């Protein structure tokens, strides 16, 4: 039997689509842990409006949230973020070094 591989985007796109990305990390990390225990091994964990909403609306640091996400799922789970093309996580185009930095960090 072939395995179907998929990526869970609910912790980025789901929050962004329904709640305007305004969800506190402490409120959803238990769900991340449960999803990981259920066997999900690939998550989209940030980027897009989620990155800036943490700073502007939640008073949280996006990098701290990503560190916590990694801690909860462990080292063997694949994480990725959404980049807005050449804007990366900003609202305006970014220079090449910023695009590369985003790719290297996330």
Which stretches of residues belong to each language-model region?
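N-terminal amphipathic alpha-helix/helix-capping segment at the start of soluble metabolic enzymes
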Residues: 1-19, 66-71
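Catalytic domains of carbohydrate-active enzymes, especially glycoside hydrolases
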Residues: 27-49, 101-106
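Active-site beta->alpha loop and helix N-cap motifs at the rims of alpha/beta catalytic domains
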Residues: 47-106
């Amino acid at each position: 039997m072939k395995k179907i591989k998929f990526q869970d985007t609910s912790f980025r796109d789901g929050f962004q689509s329904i709640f305007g990305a305004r969800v506190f990390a402490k409120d959803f990390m238990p769900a991340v842990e449960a999803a990981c225990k259920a066997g999900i091994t690939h998550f989209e964990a940030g980027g897009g409006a989620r990155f800036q909403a943490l700073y502007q609306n939640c008073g949280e640091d996006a990098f701290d949230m990503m560190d916590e996400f990694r801690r909860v799922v462990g080292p063997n789970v694949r994480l990725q973020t959404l980049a807005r093309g050449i804007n990366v996580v900003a609202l305006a185009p970014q220079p090449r070094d910023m695009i590369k930095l985003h790719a290297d960090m996330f």
